[in-house]
Amino acid sequence: MNVLQKQSIAEMKRVLRNKYFVLWSLIMPIAFYYFFTNVVNTNVPDQRAWEAHYLMSMTVFSVMGSSIMTLGIRMVQERSQGWAAFIRLTPLPDHIYLSAQMIGQSVIHVLSITVIFLFGAIINDIALSPFEWMMSGLWILFGALPFLALGTLIGLMRKVETAAGISNVLYMLLALGGGMWMPFEVMPDMMQSIGQWLPSYHFGSGAWELVRGGSPTWKNILILIAYMMLFMLLSKYIRRKQEAV
C-alpha cells in the first residue's frame, strides 16, 4: 500500500505540472459555463435550473476530458520516452503502476470538481443542499471510471500525435453526443437515438437528475459499468498482444 500511495502522489504532481490539464480541465469548462449562463441569452424558462444543470454538464465535461486526454496522452508520452519500459525493469508491478495513475487522476478530479462547483456557487449563486453537492461530486467521481479506462486504452497507442488527435475527436464527439453543450432534449432525434447509448450521456444524466432532486437510474449505472469493463478488457487484451511482440 505504501508503494501505491507514493506512486499515486507522484502521478498527481505530474498532472498538476501539465499545462494542458489546466487548459482542458479548468479554464475551458469554466469559460464555457460563464459564457452560456451569463453572456448568451438562452431563453430558458427556468434560468436557475439551467445554471445548475449546465454546471453539472461542465463539471462532467472537465472530468471526462481529464480522463481521456490528460491520462491517455501522458501514458503514450511515457511509452515513447521509455519510461514504461523502465518501470517494467523495476520491482513495481504493472497493476500498481496503472492503479496509481488512475488513483492520482481521480484525486485531481476532486480538485477539478471542487474548483468548478465553487465557481458556479460564487458566480451564479447556485443553491444546492450540502447533500446534493456531495452526491453530485461522488457521482461525477464514479462516472469518470469508464473514461479513465478509455484513457488507459488510448495510452496504448504508439505515437503521441495519433493519441492526441484521436482522444481530441473522441472527447468532442462524446461531449456533443452526450448533451454536454446543449440540453439533450433539444438535440435532433437522430442524435438523441445515438446519444442515449453513449457513456457520456449516462454520466451527465446522473448528475442532471441529482440537481433536479432525483437520483441516477440503474440504467445510468449499468451502462457506465458495462463501458468500463469493455474498455478494461480491450486494454488488457491489447497490452498482452503488445508485450508478446
Curated annotation (Swiss-Prot):
One of its GO terms (molecular function) is ABC-type transporter activity. The chain crosses the membrane at residues 20-40, 53-73, 103-123, 137-157, 164-184, 214-234. GO terms for cellular component: ATP-binding cassette (ABC) transporter complex. InterPro entries: ABC2_TM, ABC2_TM_bact-type, ABC_2_transport, Nod_factor_ABC_transporter. Signal peptide: none annotated. Residues 20-242 form the ABC transmembrane type-2 domain. The keyword Methyltransferase does not apply. It is found in: Cell membrane. Its main location: membrane. It holds the Pfam family ABC2_membrane_3. Keywords: Cell membrane, Membrane, Transmembrane, Transmembrane helix, Transport. It is a multi-pass membrane protein. Belongs to the ABC-2 integral membrane protein family. This is Putative transport permease YvfS. It comes from Bacillus subtilis (strain 168). The gene is yvfS.
